[in-house]
Amino acid sequence: MGIHGLAKLIADHAPGAIKEQDIKNYFGRKIAIDASMCIYQFLIAVRQDGNVLQSEDGETTSHLMGMFYRTIRMLENGIKPVYVFDGKPPQLKSAELEKRGERRAEAEKMLAKAQELGEQENIDKFSKRLVKVTKQHNDDCKKLLTLMGVPYIEAPCEAEASCAALVKEGKVFATATEDMDGLTFGTNVLLRHLTASEAKKLPVQEFHFNRILQDIGLTSEQFIDLCILLGCDYCGTIKGIGPKRAIDLIRQHGSIEEILENIDTSKHPAPEDWLYKEARNLFLKPEVVDSSTVDLKWREPDEEALIQFMCSEKQFSEDRIRNGCKKMMKSRQGSTQGRLDSFFSVTGSLSSKRKEPETKGSAKKKQKTGATPGKFRKGK
């Protein structure tokens, strides 16, 4: 789910913290990607005939096609992707997962009704609501990435939290995900639409966390409280408090505790046994991968093993897979050039008063570390 309405709130209150970029601007960057979010996007994608991609025995293979071609697109643009897979969900997420189960059950009823009435638009809509990323989907994608020579990490808990930890450690440049809670976990840079379909022609949205805090006038702890008020995966929210009121209250009172002391709780009741403190602590001190124990390496693809897996087992076209392997090999030759800014050290910093700061300048030091050869170990 992420954080309700956070992207719009940032666009309204801190537009200077968002940059639109072309994918080619990330040449030489190491980027941590929320794998589950990607796989979900690939699974709900439908072809022009309205059907998902399947093998002859009816097994869905949309996730493999998406992972293969989107990863190649990133490699061709000089990006060094590392996929981060979710571990066990935190206990605080159990209520949210229960709600999702209820919504899925309701979607099943609505789907059956739409099928009975022959309403194709509703059939498509409710079918997507039933999509769930399974262990098999994850295992398929991990095998594919290994054969492609692309590293992945298994997070101990939430993938976005481990992505953010890698960014904060200066190990990668950014977190790529569609969920905005990567910012709540403190990633310095968050990228949206990096793995979107090329056909959609969506520019990459680049959010800068420190600039967001500066422009909306909050500390990182206050930003977490704001996100809890907006609505997150780990607890409920105060009734009747929308985004505009939430940011006004945080600016005025500074914390959820002070807000509860000063609002009319008869009009704006908080949830019973509200676990906002636990949610805050989860954002502040999440269970994350130990970046000192991982060593990321990008290797040559194993072409024959890819043919065996993707063609013999999953029935993809051999010509297309071999062509993809050629593109990967070619991209490896080009990526050795590296980023120009990795050869220079930077002194001083840009003034915070600048209206439109150049993203490359304002993040150069972090980008420099993100572009250096890895000190990671591939998570297995």
UniProtKB/Swiss-Prot annotation:
Chain residues that bind Mg(2+) 1: D34, D86, E158, E160
Region spans: I-domain: 122-253
Record's keyword terms, sorted: DNA damage, DNA repair, DNA replication, Endonuclease, Exonuclease, Hydrolase, Magnesium, Metal-binding, Mitochondrion, Nuclease, Nucleus, Phosphoprotein
The organism's place on the tree of life at top rank: Eukaryota
Keyword Manganese attached: no
EC number: 3.1.-.-
Changes after translation: Phosphorylated. Phosphorylation upon DNA damage induces relocalization to the nuclear plasma.
Sites where the protein binds DNA: R47, R70, E158, G231, D233
Cofactor-binding details, from the entry: Binds 2 magnesium ions per subunit. They probably participate in the reaction catalyzed by the enzyme. May bind an additional third magnesium ion after substrate binding.
GO biological process, alphabetically ordered: base-excision repair; DNA replication, removal of RNA primer; retina development in camera-type eye
Similarity section: Belongs to the XPG/RAD2 endonuclease family. FEN1 subfamily.
Protein name: Flap endonuclease 1
Species per Swiss-Prot/TrEMBL record: Xiphophorus maculatus (Southern platyfish)
